[in-house]
């Protein structure tokens, strides 16, 4: 074996080893985004001057991500402002001083707090002058990447997110709706759950809730663009068997009440799932805009002290509920269980 060949082989090995280390570091550095939402408030001061308060919330996986990456992405957010008709960029707004807090949104009674699940939230607020003109405006933020282990998204580790909101033309005074609650930190397998995805609207507009397919944005090579791309935005690609109306493996399938925002699900497979829920706002029957919640559900095994549950043989549940009419006869199977070792005596 020649000396030249051995040198080249050694260099090739070193490059391969470096590449593997780099990709591992990149995976830990990039795959950390759990979800987010963007909305705004129309603010009028005493002199009649109109401003818009932009509110952006972003969630990170603080269990598996590099803490330095979270701090980097949490310290600054870029909001692109675009003409809603021509898609022309108007300006880019920097949001700083995000307020950080660890969230623990638990939606179960009698559950033992699990380990290995951690979500941190950054909230940004800034009031700026914006002129919606006659076309309206699109506000957007882009960030990459989603958790690589996301089960329902194709190539999730390279798939980013776009969070956007629409401001109607200036002759329409409007503040966007906003969700009342933080999505769940975790979801328990085989445990029926109803989540409150309701929103409130400062203008009293009519609200309608539905599932949607989240948007892509950013890239592994430019995870947090300081000039977000203009609309229109591409949709993420679902893995086989998943869709906007079937985002989490479950039986019965997930269901959202279009009038109340009540979201019921009984997940039957552990995993990580991207979930898109949006609230549409209508005024006098005219669609004004929407607020989008793009969030990651983590389905895990949970330990319960008490599980109260039943089913009806031959019955079909719709949205977690069984329907009966007067005169019907139903037989209930009690499938509750009691973990005596964990339930305190009373």
Model-derived features: positions:
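Long, compositionally biased, intrinsically disordered segments
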Residues: 28-331, 335-346
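Bacterial Sec-dependent N-terminal signal peptides
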Residues: 1-34, 324-327, 333-335
């Amino acid at each position: 074996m020649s000396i030249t060949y051995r040198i080249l082989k050694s260099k090739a090995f070193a490059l391969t080893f470096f590449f593997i280390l780099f990709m591992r570091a990149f995976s830990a550095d990039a795959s950390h985004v759990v979800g987010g939402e963007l909305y705004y408030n129309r603010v009028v001061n005493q002199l009649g001057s109109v401003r818009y308060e932009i509110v952006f919330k972003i969630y990170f996986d603080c269990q598996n991500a590099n803490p330095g990456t979270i701090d980097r992405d949490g310290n600054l957010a870029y909001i692109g402002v675009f003409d809603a008709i021509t898609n022309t960029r108007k300006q880019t707004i920097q949001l700083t001083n995000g307020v950080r807090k660890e969230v623990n949104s638990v939606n179960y009674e009698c559950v033992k707090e699990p380990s290995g699940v951690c979500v941190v939230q950054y909230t940004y607020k800034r009031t700026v002058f914006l002129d919606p003109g006659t076309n309206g405006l699109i506000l957007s933020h882009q960030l990459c990447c989603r958790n690589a282990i996301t089960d329902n998204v194709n190539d999730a580790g390279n798939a980013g997110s776009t969070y956007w909101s629409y401001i109607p033309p200036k002759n329409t005074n409007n503040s966007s709706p906003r969700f009342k609650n933080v999505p769940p930190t975790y979801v328990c397998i085989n445990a029926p759950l109803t989540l409150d995805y309701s929103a409130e609207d400062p203008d009293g507009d009519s609200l309608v809730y539905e599932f949607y397919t989240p948007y892509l944005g950013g890239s592994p090579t430019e995870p947090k663009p300081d000039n977000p791309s203009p609309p229109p935005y591409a949709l993420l690609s679902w893995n086989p068997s998943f869709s906007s109306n079937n985002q989490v493996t479950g039986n019965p399938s997930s269901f959202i009440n279009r009038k109340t925002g009540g979201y019921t699900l009984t997940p039957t497979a552990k995993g990580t799932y991207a979930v898109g829920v949006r609230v549409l706002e209508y005024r006098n029957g005219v669609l004004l805009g929407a607020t989008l919640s793009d969030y990651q559900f983590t389905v895990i095994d949970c330990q319960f002290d008490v599980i109260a549950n039943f089913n009806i043989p031959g019955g079909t549940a719709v949205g977690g509920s069984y329907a009966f009419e007067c005169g019907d006869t139903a037989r209930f199977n009690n499938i509750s269980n009691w973990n005596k070792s964990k339930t305190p005596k009373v």
